[in-house]
């Protein structure tokens, strides 16, 4: 079996060696650029780890695994455009380096390339894999729409937020786990348990992102802390702060949310102090651990020896306790 680091190395090598021979090059240069920016490559790594539970040649499914990374980066490219974000992983975003029209066209082409790469899977499983990938892509769009709609609401409930991040983030990790298992000819029950494992891990990962945006170390996290607070993004932290705050705390939160002219550091400090007094930091940690515990139940139900599952569990544990 491969370690997660060995798999990550294979993924990066495969992506770095991808060629784009079609023209115009101006359409494909932004695609190469986006995929060259690195990242954690969680989705292809999970797919290959899932496959490797059952078979020892995960390098044979690098194309469909990297299809997920292509798709994920397509969503980031369009997210950056919608958010007018200037940087991604410390580098200029596509719409800044080129322009908005290029970001749209190159992003659309990445979506097509993702399906082309996924279609290179074993023909025996092509129909099932493409059906799952298509449904997942639609769910992610639904999650993004909910996310945008939540920006105009101060009454978002925790369960609504969890469903939004399940759609926007979690289902792609679940899809990665399931496709890996399908391509490895895993038993149907194991396939479904691995999907649920990925779903629960995805929820934990997203809540960890919410938490780190407030409480992470900026030197390790890779970006300034408090970005979500500054732009009033509806996160697990903010939603539960509104839901749990007393009248005084709620009034203070509303003041900062409605304030248009403010000092960034002052707002981040004030809202973080409110989070601390309300206790949403502890709530987030408890919820992250809950989803990880749920994920462990599903992986425990997979009918394989524990030593066969050890690398996948260790990888998930490292990601859960990451500081970036």
Where in this protein do the model-derived segments appear?
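All-alpha prenyltransferase/terpene-synthase fold signal
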Residues: 1-324
């Amino acid at each position: 079996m491969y370690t997660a680091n060995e798999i990550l190395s294979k993924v990066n090598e495969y992506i770095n060696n991808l060629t784009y021979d079609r023209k115009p090059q101006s359409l494909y240069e932004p695609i190469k650029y986006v995929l060259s920016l690195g990242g954690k490559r969680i989705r292809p790594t999970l797919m290959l780890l899932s496959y490797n539970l059952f078979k020892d040649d995960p390098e044979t499914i690098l194309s469909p695994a990297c299809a997920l990374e292509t798709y994920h980066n397509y969503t980031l490219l369009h997210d950056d455009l919608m958010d007018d974000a200037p940087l991604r992983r410390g580098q200029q975003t596509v719409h800044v380096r080129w322009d908005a029209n290029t970001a749209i066209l190159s992003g659309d082409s990445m979506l097509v390339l993702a399906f082309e790469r996924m279609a290179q899977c074993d023909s025996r499983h092509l129909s099932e894999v493409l059906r799952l990938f298509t449904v997942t892509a639609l769910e992610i769009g639904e999650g993004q729409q909910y996310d945008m709609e939540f920006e105009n609401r101060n009454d978002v409930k925790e369960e609504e937020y969890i469903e939004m991040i399940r759609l926007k983030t979690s289902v792609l990790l679940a899809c990665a786990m399931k496709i890996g298992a399908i391509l490895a000819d895993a038993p149907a029950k194991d396939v479904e348990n691995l999907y649920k494992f990925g779903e629960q891990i995805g929820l934990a990962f997203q809540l960890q992102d919410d938490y780190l945006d407030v409480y992470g170390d900026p030197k390790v996290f890779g970006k300034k802390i408090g970005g979500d607070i500054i732009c009033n993004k509806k996160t697990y932290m903010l939603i539960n702060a509104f839901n749990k705050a007393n009248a005084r705390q709620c009034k203070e939160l509303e003041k900062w949310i409605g304030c248009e002219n403010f000092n960034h550091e002052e707002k981040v400090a004030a809202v973080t102090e409110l989070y601390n007094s309300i206790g949403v930091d502890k709530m987030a940690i408890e919820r992250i651990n809950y989803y990880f515990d749920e994920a462990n139940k599903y992986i425990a139900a997979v009918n394989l020896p524990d030593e066969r599952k050890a690398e996948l569990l260790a990888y998930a544990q490292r990601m859960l306790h990451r500081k970036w």
